């Protein structure tokens, strides 16, 4: 779906006041590092370490009531995303906090109500998408989550003018639960996916046309992802792409027939336990076979298969990016299974032939392979992100322009940007001004701003967002209009989120679509944490450090704020300090730091956290006898390593859905960091928890849902078996039939247990809680 309606989902963010602290190591600008956890995860991509410490001063000298767990689940404390989208060069649609959906026209600055909030209540709909011709809306209801991005839902087609309603179902099927449904790019084009086959409607009144017939439940997927492609490769549900004029549809066929099956038991609600099976490849096992097809939507059903480059086998490759470049041209990125070589192809969809435009190789792994290149109109030149070596800090990601000479054979390559910072996204190329628009971290590793650079003169570069809302926003997402005249800026922190619309020629002229007024009001009388930022010198590296400290929100000053996360309750009400250290494995600090964990997870990353903790314990306001650790998934793995290692400084720790053995995790992730088990079995062994020998009386709290499809309960079962053999005490809290992301009620219960655990641990012997990586749930 293009947009989602109703109240925004609970988002992991917290409120802070920003305060810069002088660096311990080399001078850097860390302003704005305290952005939301969601943004931190995007920025760091792998590691986001937090240490929770107890302050020696337990007396409150601040006003305002502390944050509570109940606050976290109130709508007024949650972020609202207006989900603004361009529907033409001069028009956007967006949704306000009250649920009403509007269209804004840049030509006359008028805003028109398209869809009332009462419509969602009438049809019990929670998702929506508006047709390109603005006549119809697709309403999704009875939504049932499958994995992180995928869901089943039933759909209605609602006429915005006559208010007539019709169900969207495959032929001869009623009350269907569809795997996907959305509009095309022209008029009322519509596709939906049922039982892993793609259906097409040329318009609302036309009959459905089944485009594929090979779909098999849980085995062959057409136009949507299986578990591996959804969670580890494409990172979304859809696996199809419209041509610009809507005349063709490219789609993946993912065949899991040889992929081993994982069983997820369901214990409650029946006399005997039931369960579901799904295909889940682990390291060294068969991966899905994948094929790319293009079908013509003129009624002929002509389908062309796009073949991979020579040397790539369908089961030993990933298709990580597909993008239409012109009406008949498609760019595709093919990555080998080891993820250390990629080929960017430009394909003629009428003939099925491709030419190689660029090849990348690495002796570790290749990062950012989902990033889409930007082509010129004639496809002779394109812009992509490539590593550029820096003399002292390793390589950083920068914009490279690659073009063919007049002969069509010789290729030139030159970088438009350089420095010890990363380009994160290339947004657009404006040929009328020879300008490339992009997002980068030039202002600091935890900042992201909008920039423009000239293709003719790379020294002609400017930051378009750096001077906007300085006290509130240092991390932006951006979406440019198709004519590169306007931009939607989504401020993600460190202050309250807001969405604004700007003219690129005059960025200070803007309209605000959403400024989180409800959240601002909710936080007005709450005791909101503040942050301090430092750098920590560890060996030859200078790592980022963030401390979240108890402090009241001064209502007479304009403090940057972040949204509420559960640690904020600890900080606000229990005088506990949260610390995060971005050690080896984190992004935007050069490839030397990023690749430092290659084949060494649980070793050098744990060393970085331990060394950082030793420096933290020297601070006068931290009680060194009260230190704990928290983490989920990879963070649960790392927190367990830190807690149970020899001479650990941690008193207690929590591991939520911990990865305990990388051989048990998904193939794409495990093989990326460790390689193939036949060659690297020893690397897998030293990075598992089987080597733990600690018998100290630390307190370990393990939390896991039994129906977790991402990190299976098998991991916690192996950990419990190991701890029992070592006579190490532990507490286990399971959530029957719950997945990797808990339901709202279970999440609230879990967080209450987490809070009680830390309070008990810290009260027993003057104790800190360290939080390792958390995911963007």
How would you describe each model-predicted region?
Residues 363-365, 387-391, 423-424, 441-442, ...:
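Short, contiguous acidic/charged loop-to-helix segments that flank catalytic cores in large enzymes
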Residues 143, 161, 405, 551, ...:
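Short beta-to-alpha linker loops that shape the active-site pocket of alpha/beta-hydrolase fold enzymes
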Residues 1-486, 492-497, 768, 773-777:
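Beta-propeller folds
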Residues 214-224, 516-641, 645, 660-661, ...:
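Cap/lid segment of the alpha/beta-hydrolase catalytic domain
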Residues 629-631, 656, 703:
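Short beta-strand immediately N-terminal to the catalytic nucleophile in serine-hydrolase-like folds
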Residues 701, 714-777:
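C-terminal catalytic histidine-bearing segment of alpha/beta-hydrolase fold enzymes
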């Amino acid at each position: 779906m293009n947009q989602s309606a109703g109240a925004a989902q609970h988002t992991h963010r917290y409120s802070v006041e920003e305060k810069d602290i002088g660096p311990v190591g080399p001078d850097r600008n860390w302003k704005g590092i305290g952005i939301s956890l969601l943004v931190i995860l995007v920025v760091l991509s792998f590691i986001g370490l937090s240490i929770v410490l107890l302050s020696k001063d337990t007396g409150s000298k601040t006003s305002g009531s502390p944050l509570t767990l109940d606050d976290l689940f109130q709508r007024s404390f949650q972020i609202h995303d207006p989900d603004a989208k361009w529907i033409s060069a001069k028009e956007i649609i967006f949704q306000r906090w009250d649920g009403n959906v509007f269209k804004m026209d840049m030509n006359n600055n008028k805003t028109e109500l398209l869809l009332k909030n009462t419509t969602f209540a009438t049809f019990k709909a929670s998702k929506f998408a508006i047709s390109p011709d603005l006549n119809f809306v697709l309403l999704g209801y009875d939504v049932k989550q499958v994995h992180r991005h995928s869901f089943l839902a039933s759909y209605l087609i609602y006429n915005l003018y006559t208010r007539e309603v019709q169900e969207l179902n495959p032929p001869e099927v009623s009350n269907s639960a569809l795997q996907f449904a959305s509009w095309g790019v022209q008029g009322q084009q519509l596709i939906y996916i049922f039982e892993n086959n793609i259906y097409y409607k040329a318009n609302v009144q036309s009959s459905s046309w089944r485009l594929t017939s090979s779909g098999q439940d849980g085995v062959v997927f057409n136009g949507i992802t299986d578990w591996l492609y959804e969670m580890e490769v494409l990172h979304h549900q859809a696996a199809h792409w419209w041509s610009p004029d809507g005349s063709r549809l490219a789609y993946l066929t993912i065949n899991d027939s040889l992929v081993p099956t994982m069983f997820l038991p369901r214990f409650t609600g029946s006399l005997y336990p039931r369960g579901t099976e799904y295909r889940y490849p682990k390291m060294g096992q068969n991966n899905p076979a994948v094929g790319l097809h293009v079908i013509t939507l003129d009624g002929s059903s002509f389908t062309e298969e796009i073949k991979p480059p020579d040397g790539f086998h369908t089961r030993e490759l990933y298709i990580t990016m597909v993008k239409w470049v012109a009406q008949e041209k498609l760019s595709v990125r093919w990555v080998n299974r080891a993820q250390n070589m990629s080929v960017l192809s430009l394909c003629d969809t009428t003939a099925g032939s491709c030419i190689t435009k660029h090849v990348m190789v690495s002796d570790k792994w290749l990062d950012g392979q989902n990033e889409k290149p930007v082509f010129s109109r004639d496809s002779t030149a394109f812009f992509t992100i490539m590593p550029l070596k820096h003399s002292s800090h390793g390589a950083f990601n920068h914009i490279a322009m690659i073009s063919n000479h007049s002969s069509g054979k010789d290729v030139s390559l030159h970088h438009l940007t350089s420095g010890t910072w990363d380009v994160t996204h290339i947004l657009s190329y404006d040929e009328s001004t020879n300008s490339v628009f992009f997002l980068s971290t030039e202002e600091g590793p935890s900042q992201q701003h909008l920039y423009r650079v000239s293709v003719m003169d790379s020294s002609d570069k400017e930051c378009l967002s750096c001077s906007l809302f300085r006290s509130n926003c240092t991390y932006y997402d951006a979406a440019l209009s198709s004519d590169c005249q306007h931009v939607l800026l989504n401020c993600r922190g460190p202050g309250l989120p807001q969405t604004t619309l700007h003219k690129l020629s005059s960025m200070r002229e803007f309209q605000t679509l959403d400024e989180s007024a409800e959240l601002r009001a909710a936080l007005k009388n709450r005791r909101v944490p503040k942050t301090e930022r430092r750098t920590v010198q560890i060996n030859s590296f200078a790592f980022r450090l963030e401390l979240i400290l108890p402090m009241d929100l001064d209502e007479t000053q304009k403090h940057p704020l972040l949204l509420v996360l559960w640690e904020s309750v600890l900080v606000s009400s229990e005088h506990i300090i949260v610390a995060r250290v971005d050690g080896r494995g984190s992004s935007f600090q050069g490839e030397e730091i990023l690749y430092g964990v290659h084949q060494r997870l649980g070793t050098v990353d744990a060393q970085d956290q331990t060394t950082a903790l030793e420096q933290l314990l020297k601070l006068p306001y931290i009680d060194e006898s009260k230190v704990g650790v928290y983490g989920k998934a990879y963070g649960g793995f790392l927190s367990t390593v830190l807690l149970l290692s020899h001479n650990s400084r941690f008193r207690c720790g929590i591991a939520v859905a911990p990865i305990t053995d990388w051989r048990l995790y998904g193939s794409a992730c495990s093989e990326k960091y460790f390689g193939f088990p036949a060659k690297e079995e020893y690397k897998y062994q030293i990075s598992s928890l089987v080597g733990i020998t600690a018998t100290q009386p630390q307190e370990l709290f393990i939390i896991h849902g039994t129906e977790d499809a991402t990190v299976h309960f098998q991991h916690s079962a192996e950990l419990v078996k190991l701890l029992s053999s070592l006579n190490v005490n532990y507490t286990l809290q399971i959530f029957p039939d719950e997945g990797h992301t808990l339901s709202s009620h279970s999440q609230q219960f879990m967080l209450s247990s987490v809070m009680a655990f830390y309070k008990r641990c810290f009260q027993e012997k003057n104790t800190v809680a360290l939080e390792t990586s958390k995911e963007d749930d």
